[in-house]
Structure formats: structure tokens, C-alpha cells
């Protein structure tokens, strides 16, 4: 197994960490977490696993092969860099750059730039055949300053934010103010252990955000909504991204016209802009957890979001699910979402 590290989002850090682990697990990669730092996860796993993290993750930013980790002081960094065989890493005549990311207040901007230059010089002393290229290098070395440490290695993949930005609710042809953002939806798809070619259900599909994120990683997506307008809008949005859902059906989430699915991801309606058909959010959550239970096999997962005040963990456990984890995502002053993951027992 290779020594790897991942720079994860600080937006919802616990979600980011759980998403990374879920991707490795659902794709069948054994791993050992060696250290969890602020926005940085060090672990040992097959380096091939990075391809799946890059393909699937919403909240991972950079994937890298670790070369060294040391205290974030000049002497320790110089010693660690001088002990690293850069000449065997950089091919003859190849170019490289060094980039340093600072997390929170663990460093200053000036210190970060100074460290980039310092490490560049140390690498050139070791690999005299190499050249620096800051615009289009053959290799990028990335360092993360966090928790008074420098985690340093070769960048293998970077997840660009632009595709997720292009799939924001207001960028889609059919918009509704209650729609979830694409990053959180993708993360929930991953937490539900959605596999390629597996069947994922969103019984409150709304504008189709979850269906889009599931389809983009090769999952067969089924959407259900009680409103014809929303079901048609979801179809319109998937078509906009050239995606074909398994099915989008107008039906009541409490009376699902299905016999089996592999996982469930959903964000039931709540708030002033959502249509709850005169039912309380707690009643809706209870109803959908009851109905989807009949569709899932033992060990299969549901990832569901609801207002923190609902107490979704208690509802799920009372209905016989095993509660695996919960995360809390602040939305605005009157709403903090609880993202809960359950397993059918």
C-alpha cells in the first residue's frame, strides 16, 4: 500500500472525511488512516484508489502521494527534504513546481511563498537534471501546512470546483428554492454506498439534484415526486446534462411503486418554499423511512437529510435501522441540516 494524503474541504469537515472513507470502502480499497489533521487526511491505501476518489468525491480537493511529514520549522523541513530522493522521482529533463497550501492560521502568506522557494532550491540540489516550470510543469509537489506540521508529496489529482459550480441550482433550467446544492448531494450519494450500475432511489427527487449526481458516477437513478411539475422539472434538468435516469415517476413517497433498490438518498421537503402537502416534516420523515425499508436489503444504506430539530436519528432507530453516523451542515440562521446515514438490519 502507498502512503497517500488528501486535502479535504473545510466547509463541512466531518462530512468530507466520511465521504473519503465511504468512497474507498464502496470501491473495495483497504485503507489505514495514519493521521487526521485539520483538512488533511494521511492514510495508506492502493494508489489506484485515487482514481475513484477523483472521479467521485465532492469534498476532496487534492490527492497526493506522501514523501514526508515533519514539524513545520526550517531545520526539520530541510532535513526531511534532503533525505528524499527527488532525482529518482523527477525524470531526466523533466520540470516541476512546488505549491504550499496553508490551513487556517497555521502559517502566513509570506511564509508560504518563502517555503515554496526554499523547497524548490532543495529539490534542485538533489535532482540537478530537473528544471522549474511554474506554468505547465511535468510534476507538482504539494505541501500542506496544518497542525504545525508540513505534509509534503507529489500531487496525483486535483478535483476542480467548476463542474459543481456549473450544476448549482440556479444554473439549471428548472429551479426551485428548496433545491440542495450539488456538492452536498454528491456527498450523500457517496455516503449511501452508491455503486456503479446499482439502483439508487430518491423518493423526494424535486429538481433532480441527487439523480444528476448519482447518474454522473454511473449509478442507475430512480426519482419519485408527488408533484407532476417537480417530476417534469427533474426530467428537464437531467436532459440538460445529457443524463438518462432509470425512471422518474409521479407518486407518493409513502406508497412507493417499487419492489427493490440498492440504496436511498433523499432530502424530504421542509421549510416555507417546500411542498409538504399539509404533513409535518417529522411525519414525512417517519413515513419515508418506513416505506423505503421494504425496498432495501440487509446491510444496504439510506442517507437522508432533515432539519436538526427533527431528531432523525431517534426516528430511524425506532423504526429498526442501525444509525451509522450523523453530520450537521449549517445552511442559514433558521436551518441546520442533519445528514444521517442508516443501514437496514
Regions found by a protein language model. Give the residues of each.
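Class I S-adenosyl-L-methionine-dependent methyltransferase catalytic core
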Residues: 1-62, 69, 76-83, 103-115, ...
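Phosphate-coordination loops involved in phosphoryl transfer and adenosine-cofactor binding
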Residues: 92-95, 197
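Short secondary-structure capping/junction motifs at helix and strand boundaries
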Residues: 95-97, 124-136
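A broadly conserved amphipathic alpha-helix scaffold signal in soluble, globular proteins
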Residues: 117-124, 190
Amino acid at each position: 500500500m502507498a502512503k497517500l494524503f488528501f486535502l479535504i474541504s473545510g466547509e463541512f469537515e466531518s462530512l468530507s472525511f466520511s465521504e473519503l472513507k465511504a468512497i474507498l470502502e464502496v470501491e473495495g480499497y483497504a485503507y489505514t488512516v495514519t493521521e487526521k489533521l485539520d483538512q488533511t487526511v494521511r492514510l495508506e491505501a492502493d494508489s489506484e484508489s485515487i482514481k475513484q476518489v477523483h472521479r467521485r468525491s465532492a469534498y476532496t480537493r487534492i490527492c497526493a502521494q506522501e514523501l514526508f511529514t515533519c514539524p513545520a520549522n526550517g531545520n526539520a523541513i530541510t532535513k526531511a527534504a534532503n533525505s528524499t530522493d527527488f532525482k529518482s522521482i523527477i525524470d531526466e529533463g523533466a520540470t516541476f513546481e512546488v505549491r504550499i497550501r496553508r490551513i487556517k492560521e497555521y502559517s502566513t502568506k509570506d511564509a508560504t511563498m518563502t517555503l515554496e522557494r526554499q523547497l524548490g532550491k532543495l529539490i534542485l540540489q538533489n535532482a540537478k537534471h530537473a528544471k522549474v516550470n511554474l506554468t505547465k510543469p511535468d510534476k507538482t509537489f504539494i505541501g500542506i501546512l496544518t497542525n504545525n506540521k508540513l505534509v509534503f508529496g507529489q500531487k496525483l489529482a486535483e478535483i476542480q470546483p467548476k463542474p459543481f459550480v456549473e450544476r448549482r441550482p440556479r444554473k439549471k433550467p428548472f429551479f426551485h428554492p428548496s433545491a440542495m446544492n450539488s456538492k452536498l448531494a454528491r456527498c450523500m450519494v457517496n455516503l449511501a454506498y452508491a455503486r456503479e450500475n446499482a439502483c439508487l432511489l430518491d423518493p423526494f427527487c424535486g429538481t433532480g439534484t441527487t439523480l444528476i449526481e448519482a447518474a454522473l458516477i454511473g449509478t442507475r437513478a430512480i426519482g419519485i415526486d408527488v408533484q407532476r411539475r417537480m417530476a417534469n422539472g427533474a426530467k428537464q434538468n437531467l436532459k440538460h446534462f445529457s443524463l438518462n435516469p432509470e425512471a422518474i415517476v409521479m407518486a407518493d413517497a409513502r406508497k412507493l411503486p417499487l419492489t427493490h433498490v440498492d440504496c436511498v438518498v433523499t432530502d424530504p421537503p421542509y421549510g416555507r418554499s417546500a411542498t409538504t402537502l399539509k404533513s409535518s416534516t417529522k411525519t414525512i420523515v417517519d413515513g419515508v423511512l418506513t416505506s423505503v425499508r421494504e425496498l432495501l436489503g440487509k446491510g444496504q444504506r439510506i442517507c437522508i437529510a432533515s432539519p436538526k430539530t427533527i431528531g432523525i436519528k431517534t426516528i430511524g432507530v425506532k423504526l429498526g435501522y442501525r444509525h451509522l453516523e450523523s453530520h450537521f451542515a449549517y445552511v442559514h440562521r433558521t436551518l441546520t441540516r442533519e445528514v444521517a446515514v442508516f443501514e437496514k438490519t
